[in-house]
Structures are given as structure tokens and as C-alpha cells.
């Protein structure tokens, strides 16, 4: 039944996260969105919880509160930040903040959700990483902490497969209409045409492109796919991208 499908999405208030929430709602899920700010969407079936996921203690508390209220069996950790800096300017605080956001939050949320997933012998976990794990200048803390998601997914896939739980990664390339992309490349930037020309499919991605990949991984029919990384990047993972 529709009411029995519960998903948690981090960073669900805008961009890729909002597109993922919309897709899940259309598929009949009750969706809990964890974000720093509310979307204001007011969609039926959407439950919004405001939390700073870079705050490890607040994240753990929010995770346990959500899991006590909702039987979450689908978890999508999408929230992220970049902190673009050359190597000389990267601080340990930058590294710790993005480690908390990208990796510690994933761990806290997964540990909180695991009892329900194991009890139901079903779970779908998607970690939203980035094409930048293959290397991109001035992304030291972003690339390294997002790359850690691939290690989490492969390890958890081995540990949890016998419990009916799959864990996969979606790694987007340049996605328009997202704060993270346009923080680096404004919509009126003269660099934009050059970036598009460097993408094999000759366009930027859209949030819906990523949501469709997530939709595949969370399907009950995807139970034989786990520990995998799907690049949703217009082909830049097999070539390069110019910023």
C-alpha cells in the first residue's frame, strides 16, 4: 500500500533533492526531507524536518527522531556542499565540515534506519556523490569526502545484502538549476557555453536526470543491483570536463 512506503531524503528542499522528493511522491511514498531550510512546497505526503547536517550531534538526534516516527526503508543521502578552494587555502575545518555532511551524516542516518530495514528484510539506500570523485581542480574536500561515499556503499552492500538491503551510488555531473552548480558557474557566466561544449551529450544535466537514476535504484525490482556507482554526467566520466 502507498502508506507503507516511507523514504527519507536529505537536502530535499531544492535542486536535485527536490526532484528526488517529487519523484518519490509521484510513486506513492511518504517522504521525509531533512534540510537546513524548508522548501515551502506543502506537498501532500511530504514531511519536512529542518537540521544542519554538518552538525554531527544535531544529525544524530534528528535521525533517531525521524526513525521513531516513520518506518523508513528507503534512504537517499543527497545533501552536499563544495567549498571550492585551491589546495593552499583548504583548512582542516573545511575537511571536517564536509566529512560531517557527506560521510558522518550518512553513517548516522543509516545506523538509525537499519533496525527497521532489517526487521522488514528490505532496504534501499542511495548515496548521491559526484563526478568530481574522478578528479576536479580546487575540489579537495568535496572530491575526497564524496569519494568516501563509494567506499561506504561497497562495504555496506557486502554487509547488508543478506538482509534484503541494497546500497548504491549516483554520481551526478554538472546539473543546472542547482545552487551548488550556479555557486561556481553563474547562469550568465561566459564559461557556460565552453562547459556545455566539453560535455559529450552537449547539454547540462537536469535535476530530473538524477532523480530518474535514484528511482531505478530504489525500486523493489532492483534487488540484484548493489554496491554500484552510476555516473549521471552526460559522458564526462569517460572523458573530461572544462570549468
Show the residue positions of the predicted features.
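Conserved glycine-rich cofactor-binding loop
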Residues: 13-14
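A glycine/serine/threonine-rich, flexible loop-to-helix segment
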Residues: 44, 162, 175-199, 239-243
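Conserved NAD(P)H cofactor-binding loop of Rossmann-fold oxidoreductase domains
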Residues: 78-84, 235
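Substrate-binding pocket helix/loop in short-chain dehydrogenase/reductase
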Residues: 86-87, 94-99, 191, 195
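Alpha-helical segment proximal to the catalytic Tyr-Lys
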Residues: 115, 158-162, 223
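Catalytic loop of short-chain dehydrogenase/reductase
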Residues: 126-148, 153-162, 174
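Short C-terminal tail/terminal secondary-structure segment
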Residues: 215, 226-243
Amino acid at each position: 500500500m502507498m502508506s507503507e512506503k516511507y523514504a527519507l531524503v536529505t537536502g530535499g528542499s531544492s535542486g536535485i533533492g527536490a526532484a528526488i522528493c517529487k519523484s518519490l511522491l509521484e510513486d506513492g511514498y511518504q517522504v521525509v526531507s531533512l534540510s537546513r531550510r524548508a522548501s515551502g512546497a506543502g506537498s501532500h505526503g511530504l514531511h519536512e524536518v529542518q537540521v544542519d547536517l554538518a552538525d554531527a550531534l544535531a544529525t544524530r538526534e534528528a535521525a533517531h527522531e525521524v526513525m521513531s516516527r516513520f518506518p523508513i526503508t528507503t534512504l537517499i543521502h543527497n545533501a552536499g556542499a563544495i567549498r571550492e578552494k585551491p589546495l593552499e587555502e583548504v583548512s582542516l575545518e573545511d575537511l571536517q565540515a564536509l566529512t560531517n555532511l557527506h560521510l558522518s551524516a550518512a553513517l548516522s542516518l543509516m545506523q538509525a534506519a537499519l533496525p527497521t530495514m532489517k526487521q522488514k528484510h528490505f532496504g534501499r539506500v542511495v548515496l548521491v556523490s559526484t563526478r568530481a570523485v574522478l578528479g576536479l581542480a580546487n575540489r579537495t574536500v568535496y572530491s575526497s569526502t564524496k569519494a568516501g561515499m563509494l567506499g561506504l556503499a561497497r562495504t555496506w552492500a557486502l554487509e547488508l545484502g543478506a538482509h534484503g538491503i541494497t546500497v548504491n551510488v549516483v554520481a551526478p555531473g554538472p546539473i543546472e538549476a542547482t545552487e551548488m552548480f550556479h555557486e561556481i558557474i553563474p547562469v550568465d557566466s561566459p564559461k557556460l557555453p565552453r562547459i556545455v561544449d566539453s560535455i559529450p551529450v552537449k547539454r547540462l544535466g537536469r535535476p530530473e536526470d538524477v532523480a530518474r537514476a535514484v528511482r531505478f535504484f530504489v525500486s523493489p525490482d532492483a534487488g540484484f543491483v548493489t554496491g554500484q556507482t552510476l555516473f549521471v554526467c552526460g559522458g564526462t566520466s569517460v572523458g573530461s570536463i572544462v570549468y
